[in-house]
Amino acid sequence: MKFMKKSLVGIIMGSSSDSRIMHAAAEILDGFDVPHEDQIISAHRTPTRLEEYAKHAEKNGFKVIIAGAGGAAHLPGMIASHTVLPVIGVPILVYNDKQQKKSAFGGLDSLLSISEMPTGSPVVTVGVNKAANAGIYALKILAIESSSIRKMLKSHKEKQHKSVLKESQDLKR
């Protein structure tokens, strides 16, 4: 398996249908000029590839992995079981491709699968379909060692703060 060497974050998902959600994590990282590598790796259909990816992630320069999955959502936990890198899990609300209906559990199945990992293989879990929050959390992890990312995150928070103040002022008019 070939991996890019300069990426700091691995963004993986169980299938191409997850990409519309996981794109939000990539957009956040792109906004901070943080290189990432995006791949589809299925815990159930490509288990050998999953193991290889996880075992080589640190050697290939990754600092954190964002893993999105729907349904039984084993991908984040399986990745976490094969690496010491932090793994951020994104539960994805699954849609039935043929009928365009949401899963019967509304994403709760994925949320519980990812958040209820056994002791020793933890996965940080964000809300259902909240890949952007996974991107922000990955930046916070990277900011521990990178003063430039830390500075950009502080600026981002300040912009959010000002935006809310402006919205509040506009509401009073």
List where the protein language model places each region.
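Acidic, glycine/proline-rich low-complexity segments that act as flexible tails and inter-domain linkers
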Residues: 3-7, 38, 71, 83, ...
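Glycine-rich phosphate/diphosphate-binding loop of Rossmann-like nucleotide-binding domains
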Residues: 5-45
